[in-house]
UniProtKB/Swiss-Prot annotation:
<keyword id="KW-1133">Transmembrane helix</keyword>
<feature type="transmembrane region" description="Helical">
    <location>
        <begin position="117"/>
        <end position="137"/>
    </location>
</feature>
<feature type="transmembrane region" description="Helical">
    <location>
        <begin position="81"/>
        <end position="101"/>
    </location>
</feature>
<keyword id="KW-0406">Ion transport</keyword>
<feature type="topological domain" description="Cytoplasmic">
    <location>
        <begin position="67"/>
        <end position="80"/>
    </location>
</feature>
<feature type="transmembrane region" description="Helical">
    <location>
        <begin position="46"/>
        <end position="66"/>
    </location>
</feature>
<feature type="transmembrane region" description="Helical">
    <location>
        <begin position="177"/>
        <end position="197"/>
    </location>
</feature>
<dbReference type="InterPro" id="IPR002524">
    <property type="entry name" value="Cation_efflux"/>
</dbReference>
<keyword id="KW-0813">Transport</keyword>
<keyword id="KW-0812">Transmembrane</keyword>
<keyword id="KW-0472">Membrane</keyword>
<dbReference type="Pfam" id="PF01545">
    <property type="entry name" value="Cation_efflux"/>
</dbReference>
<feature type="topological domain" description="Cytoplasmic">
    <location>
        <begin position="138"/>
        <end position="176"/>
    </location>
</feature>
<comment type="function">
    <text>Involved in sequestration of excess metal in the cytoplasm into vacuoles to maintain metal homeostasis.</text>
</comment>
<feature type="topological domain" description="Cytoplasmic">
    <location>
        <begin position="1"/>
        <end position="15"/>
    </location>
</feature>
<feature type="topological domain" description="Vacuolar">
    <location>
        <begin position="198"/>
        <end position="202"/>
    </location>
</feature>
<feature type="topological domain" description="Vacuolar">
    <location>
        <begin position="37"/>
        <end position="45"/>
    </location>
</feature>
Length: 316
């Protein structure tokens, strides 16, 4: 299936594409008005919209790439493209937020005259666009869950997911988009407030203060994405499974005939796919098939979808 057909056939992709077009069009309006009126608040809000557009485009592309089948070069598929893109996007957002804060402090020390003739109209228009985005993605944020997909392992790959505990995974792609739009909405509210204060009170300092507020919204909304994507790329044990994995290891050690567990590795392949491998040392007289099945059931219940177990008989 080509990318265009994928967008047309998938409800979530259609929503992303539609809002991407709306957001991109109004971003240019905000940039133009911001530079003409010399409003840092409006320019910073437009910068955030620029990265929102990048996030939307990445999410749209990732939703297509993630569907491509695994091949000889990408044995696990390309699901990690979304994770890598999210990390890069998060780093740039933090940098933009820091630059806006620095510029804001300069303007607090040396306030500049700002033209408010068209600023209020543009600010309210930006708020309307972001409210449309919230309506678009609120349902997905509230209800969407990712489906866990298993990958074929090496020595023994367990694929019976019906035995696993009923776990739901948030669709991190849609969640991230919703949080971006929510932060943008709060930023638009700040721009409208600062414009009103400048127009009717003459408080020029309201513009840089609003910009600092927007920057805080940008950074605070992106830090969880930055941390989570970095942990996935560094193959950290999933935070949500730490306790369950420890209990699973204890349960496996209680199986009759098991001597020890070695070379144990668990990591997030993508936001939803969890992979585990380990060597299981058992006694020579133990039943390999029975022990493998019991160990597989235990780790499936702990949330590991793709499990590879190597059985090693050890003389005692």
């Amino acid at each position: 299936m080509g990318p265009v057909r994928h967008i047309l056939n998938e409800r979530k992709s259609r929503k992303i594409a539609a809002f991407l077009l709306i957001n991109t069009a109004y971003m240019f309006v905000e940039f133009t008005s911001g530079f003409m009126s010399d409003s840092l608040g409006l320019i910073s809000d437009a910068c955030h919209m620029l990265f929102d557009c990048a996030a939307l485009a990445i999410g749209l592309y990732a939703s297509y790439i993630a569907r491509l089948p695994a091949n000889g070069l990408y044995n696990y598929g390309r699901g990690r493209f979304e994770v890598l893109s999210g990390y890069v996007n998060a780093v740039f957002l933090v940098l933009v937020g820091a630059l806006i804060v620095l510029e804001s402090f300069e303007r607090i020390l040396e306030p500049r005259e700002i033209s408010t003739s068209s600023l209020l109209t543009v600010s309210i228009g930006g708020l309307v666009v972001n409210v449309i985005g919230l309506v678009f993605f609120h349902e997905e944020h509230h209800h969407a869950h990712g489906e866990a997909h298993s990958c074929n392992g090496g020595l023994q790959s367990s694929e019976n997911h019906n035995k696993s505990r009923n776990r739901h995974h948030i669709d991190h792609n849609m969640e991230g988009i919703f949080l971006h739009v929510l932060a943008d909405t709060m930023g638009s509210v700040g721009v409208v407030i600062s414009t009103l204060l400048i127009k009717y009170k003459g408080w020029l300092i309201a513009d840089p203060i609003c910009s600092v507020f927007i920057s805080i919204m940008i950074v605070s909304s992106v830090l969880p994405l930055l941390r989570n994507s970095a942990e996935i790329l560094l193959q950290r044990v999933p935070r949500s499974l730490e306790k369950d994995i420890k209990e699973a290891l204890d349960d496996v050690m209680k199986i009759k005939g098991v001597i020890g567990v070695h070379n144990f590795h668990v990591w997030n392949l993508t936001n939803t796919d969890i992979v585990g491998t380990f060597h299981l040392h058992i006694t020579t007289e133990a039943d390999k098939s029975s022990i493998r099945e019991k160990a597989s059931d235990i780790f499936h219940e702990a949330g590991i979808q793709d499990l590879t177990i190597q059985i090693e008989c050890v003389k005692r």
